[in-house]
C-alpha cells in the first residue's frame, strides 16, 4: 500500500496527464484515505467505508490514463474493467462477480512476485547449484564445482546448452473449461485435473542464460508457502483493493428507449451489491467487497449520469467532471509530459539513425490542426494527436531506412507540407484524420 501524500500523487499524475486537476485530487484523496484507514484502531477501521468515485468527461481527456497511472502508484491490488463486457446473471457471458475473481487472481500474482523478492538470495543460490550440477555432473568434486561457479558468475557459461528437469506447467485438461466462463466461484475442471497431474517435470534443453529466470522462479516457489501467499493476497484485496470500471455510461438504460436490454440495467443491478458490500466466492476463498474502492468513469455523450439507477448513483457519492481539452492543452501534451508523442517519435526514428528536432511553431501547428479537426469532425480529445502525428510522419517513417544519418526539423512548414491540404478539406479529414 502506497504512503504517498495527495500532493505527491497529484505531482506524479501531472507528469503524464495535463490538466484535470479536480479528478487528480479526487483519486489522490481516495488513495490517501486507504492509508489513513490503516492507521485506525481495528473497531473503527471496519466502520470506515471508501467513498466511491464517478468520473464524467468526454472521450480522450484522461479518464483511462488516470486509472493506468494510479495502478502503478497504488501498490495495491488493482483491476481495470469495461462495464460493456458483462451481462446480467442468467445470460451467456461474464457476470460482474468475475471482477472480484480477476482482482484476486491479479493480487495472487502480485503477492507471489513480491514474496519471491524476499527469498531471492536463497533462490539464486539454489538455482546456481542446479545449473552447476547440470554442467559439471552430479558426482563432480567440490573443487570442480567451485571452478564452474566462478565461470557462471563471470558469465562465461551463458551460451552453454544444458539439459534440466523443469516443472511441467501444461494442463492436459485445459480444454474442459467452458470458454470465457472458467472459475464460476469454484475450482474449474481443468484445475482439478491439473492438480491431479501436478508435480510432473519435463526435461528441457536451454542455454544457461535462458534457464536463469525459470530456475529462479521454481526455487523461489519452493521456499514460499502457498497458504501464506493466498491469505496475504485475499487480505490485500479486501482491505486495499481498487476496481476501475470504465464505460459505465454504456450500461445506462436511457429513458427514451423501450424493451428489455440484457447487458444494461441488469448489469447495473448486479453491480449494486458488489459496490455496497457483499461476499463473493472465489477459488481461493470468500472475499468481502465492503472496503474495495470502486472508481467508475464514462463519457456520457448520449446517456446522462441521472440515467444510472438511483441506487447506483447513491453508491458513487463523489462526482468529478473532466473538461474537454483545448489547443493549449495539446501543446503541453506534446511538450511537457514524460511520455510525450514527440519523444516517442524521436526515439523511434533514432533507431534508423534519423535525428528529429521539433520546433515550438511545429508543435503549435500540430496542436492547432488536432484542435481544428476535433472541432469540425468529432471531438475525440488527445487521441486525435495520434492520428495527426502518424499522418505527419507517414512519409518519413517509410523512407527512414534510406535516410540514415539525416537530421529532420519538424517546424510549421514541415507540418503544413505533410498535412495542410488534408486538414483544410473537412471532407478529407472526416475520413483520413
From Swiss-Prot:
Which UniProt keywords are given for this protein, alphabetically ordered?
ATP-binding, Chaperone, Cytoplasm, Nucleotide-binding, Stress response
From what superkingdom does this record's organism come? Answer: Bacteria
Q: Which GO terms describe its biological process?
A: protein unfolding; proteolysis involved in protein catabolic process
What is the annotated localization of this protein? Cytoplasm
Q: Name one GO cellular component term.
A: HslUV protease complex
What InterPro entries does UniProt report for this protein, alphabetically? Answer: AAA+_ATPase, ATP-dep_Clp_protease_ClpX, ATPase_AAA_core, Clp_ATPase_C, HslU, P-loop_NTPase
Detail which positions bind ATP. Answer: 18, 60-65, 246, 311, 383
Q: Which Pfam families match?
A: AAA, AAA_2
What molecular function terms (GO) are annotated for this protein? ATP binding; ATP hydrolysis activity; peptidase activity; proteasome-activating activity
| Keyword flag Membrane | no
Major location category of this protein: cytoplasm
Which family, according to the similarity comment?
Answer: Belongs to the ClpX chaperone family. HslU subfamily.
Matching HAMAP family = HslU
Question: Subunit comment for this entry?
Answer: A double ring-shaped homohexamer of HslV is capped on each side by a ring-shaped HslU homohexamer. The assembly of the HslU/HslV complex is dependent on binding of ATP.
NCBIfam families noted in UniProt: hslU, PRK05201.1
Function as written in the Swiss-Prot or TrEMBL entry: ATPase subunit of a proteasome-like degradation complex; this subunit has chaperone activity. The binding of ATP and its subsequent hydrolysis by HslU are essential for unfolding of protein substrates subsequently hydrolyzed by HslV. HslU recognizes the N-terminal part of its protein substrates and unfolds these before they are guided to HslV for hydrolysis.
This protein is called ATP-dependent protease ATPase subunit HslU
Amino acid at each position: 500500500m502506497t504512503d504517498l501524500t495527495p500532493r505527491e500523487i497529484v505531482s506524479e499524475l501531472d507528469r503524464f496527464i495535463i490538466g484535470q486537476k479536480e479528478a487528480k485530487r479526487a483519486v489522490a484523496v481516495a488513495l490517501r484515505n486507504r492509508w489513513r484507514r490503516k492507521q485506525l484502531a481495528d473497531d473503527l477501521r471496519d466502520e470506515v467505508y471508501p467513498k466511491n468515485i464517478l468520473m464524467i468527461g468526454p472521450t480522450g481527456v484522461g479518464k483511462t490514463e488516470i486509472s493506468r497511472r494510479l495502478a502503478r502508484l497504488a501498490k495495491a491490488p488493482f483491476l481495470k474493467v469495461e462495464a460493456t463486457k458483462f451481462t446480467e446473471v442468467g445470460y451467456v457471458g461474464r457476470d460482474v462477480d468475475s471482477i472480484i475473481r480477476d482482482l484476486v487472481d491479479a493480487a495472487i500474482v502480485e503477492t507471489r512476485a513480491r514474496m519471491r523478492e524476499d527469498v531471492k538470495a536463497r533462490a539464486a543460490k539454489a538455482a546456481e547449484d542446479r545449473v552447476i550440477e547440470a554442467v559439471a555432473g552430479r558426482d563432480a568434486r567440490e573443487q570442480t564445482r567451485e571452478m564452474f561457479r566462478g565461470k557462471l558468475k563471470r558469465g562465461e557459461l551463458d551460451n552453454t546448452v544444458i539439459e534440466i528437469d523443469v516443472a511441467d506447467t501444461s494442463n492436459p485438461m485445459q480444454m474442459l473449461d467452458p470458454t470465457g466462463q472458467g472459475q464460476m466461484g469454484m475450482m474449474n475442471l481443468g484445475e482439478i485435473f491439473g492438480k491431479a497431474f501436478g508435480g510432473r517435470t519435463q526435461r528441457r534443453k536451454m542455454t544457461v542464460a535462458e534457464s536463469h529466470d525459470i530456475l529462479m522462479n521454481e526455487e523461489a516457489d519452493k521456499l514460499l508457502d502457498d497458504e501464506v501467499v493466498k491469505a496475504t493476497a485475499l487480505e490485500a484485496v479486501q482491505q486495499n483493493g481498487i476496481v476501475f470500471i470504465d464505460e459505465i455510461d454504456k450500461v445506462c438504460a436511457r429513458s427514451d428507449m423501450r424493451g428489455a436490454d440484457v447487458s444494461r440495467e441488469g448489469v447495473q443491478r448486479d453491480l449494486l451489491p458488489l459496490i455496497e458490500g457483499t461476499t463473493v466466492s472465489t477459488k481461493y476463498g470468500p472475499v468481502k467487497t465492503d472496503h474495495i474502492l470502486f472508481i467508475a468513469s464514462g463519457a456520457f455523450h448520449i446517456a446522462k449520469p441521472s440515467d444510472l439507477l438511483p441506487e447506483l448513483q447513491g453508491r458513487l457519492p463523489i462526482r468529478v467532471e473532466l473538461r474537454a481539452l483545448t489547443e493549449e492543452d495539446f501543446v503541453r501534451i506534446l511538450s511537457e509530459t514524460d511520455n510525450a508523442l514527440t519523444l516517442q517519435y524521436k526515439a523511434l526514428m533514432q533507431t534508423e539513425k534519423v535525428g528529429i528536432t521539433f520546433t515550438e511553431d511545429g508543435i503549435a501547428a500540430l496542436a492547432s490542426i488536432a484542435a481544428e479537426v476535433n472541432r469540425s469532425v468529432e471531438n475525440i480529445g488527445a487521441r486525435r494527436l495520434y492520428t495527426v502525428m502518424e499522418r505527419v510522419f507517414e512519409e518519413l517513417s517509410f523512407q527512414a531506412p534510406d535516410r540514415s544519418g539525416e537530421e529532420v526539423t519538424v517546424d510549421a512548414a514541415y507540418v503544413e507540407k505533410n498535412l495542410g491540404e488534408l486538414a483544410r478539406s473537412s471532407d478529407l479529414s472526416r475520413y483520413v484524420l
